[in-house]
Structures are given as C-alpha cells and as structure tokens.
Amino acid sequence: MIKEFKEFIMRGNVLDMAVGVILGAALKSIVDSLTKNLINPIISLFVGQVDLSGIAVTIPGTKAVFQIGNFLNDVINFLIIAIIVFLIVKGFNKLRDMGKKTEEEVAEEAAPTQEELYLKEIRDLLANKDHQ
C-alpha cells in the first residue's frame, strides 16, 4: 500500500498539482497586496474611501449588512488572478506549439519533391554509366 501511494505521489500530475497549489497560494498573497496597496487607492479617487472593505449597506430595520466592499475586493483579486493564470497558460501553450511540427511540415519533410526525385534518377543514371 505504501509502494502504491509512493507511485501515485511520484507521478508527474500530482507533483505538478502540488507545485501549482503552492504557487497559487503565493500568488494570492501578492495579488492581495496589489489590490490593497495599489488598486484600492486608485479606486478611492472615485469612491472616496481608501479601504473598500469599509463599504457596506445596512438593511433598514434589521441588523443585516451587505459587505459590498469585501465583495469588491474579492472580485478584483479574482479578476487579477484569472488574467495572470490566462497569460501563463497562453504562454505555455505557445511554447508547446512552437516545439511541435504541423502535419504539413512533417509530410513535406517525409515526401521528396518531384525535383529531388529527378535529381536522384539522374545521379543513379550517371553512376550506372560510369560503372559500365
């Protein structure tokens, strides 16, 4: 059972996922800081509050409070992370595609052109003529 678990853990997909989770956690803290220290002050120019988490709406006659500011912070964080992940995936896909040859390129390399066939035929005829 331990051997099976070790094989499972050592597979590339599990290790890739573990690295992704760790990097994702690190990225989240960076994005939180970006939102808090750079984006919120810019938004405060329009809203009037530096800390968006303070924006809330209380329903009259109740104690229910809609924490709109916290929600806006989370939406901003999500959008930033989504854009970063999209750009990373797009970059990796582009690198992967650069390494692959298209089917047409492979077919072109495999099949000799008509000119190459004629040249080989001429070469073979000349070689046979010299040996006779």
UniProtKB/Swiss-Prot annotation:
Gene Ontology molecular-function annotations: mechanosensitive monoatomic ion channel activity
Keywords attached to this entry: Cell membrane, Ion channel, Ion transport, Membrane, Transmembrane, Transmembrane helix, Transport
Transmembrane segments: 14-34, 39-59, 68-88
Keyword Ion transport included in the entry's annotation: yes
Subcellular compartments: Cell membrane
Pfam families: MscL
The protein's name in its UniProt record: Large-conductance mechanosensitive channel
